[in-house]
Amino acid sequence: MSRWYELCDSLGLYVMDEADIEEHGLRGTLASTPDWYAAFMDRAVRMAERDKNYPSIVMWSMGNESGYGPNFAAISAWLHDFDPTRPVHYEGAQGVDGNPDPKTVDVISRFYTRVKQEYLNPGIAEGEDKERAENARWERLLEIAERTNDDRPVMTSEYAHSMGNALGNFKEYWDEIYSNPRMLGGFI
């Protein structure tokens, strides 16, 4: 990994360094379980200690799609104390009812947000188009950025996933990203 970061340093590429914490299917169970605290902290601390001197790393990410709980709040507090110069990101932070974007993260992040409303195919009856119900789950990135009750930057941490011929809509994504100064961009 160090060679990659050295290349990013020399080429001027920005990196979001992510701890390897991912628990698909468990919906935050481990993030809220004290027995997992040490394992969560170990991954984040080792990442930050290992990579702290690479100027290409502009942001720490606590993990991905693992729900939210006290273990992530503790990681965020540690990262902010260890390195107050870099923002802290975590895509799964929106998992808390009533507090979808806790202040323990510095960046609001979603994956696979949708862009234009017409992609929902509103003229098709429910059930006729399997994609319609699936697409309706995802928030629209621009709507998140236009919320006035929060001034943190907004980004899509995963988008344009390439499965079948699904890769695309780059122009539509970037038109929306460029339309609002709170938008940071995204990761493919």
Which stretches of residues belong to each language-model region?
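Substrate-binding/catalytic cleft of secreted carbohydrate-active enzymes
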Residues: 1-188
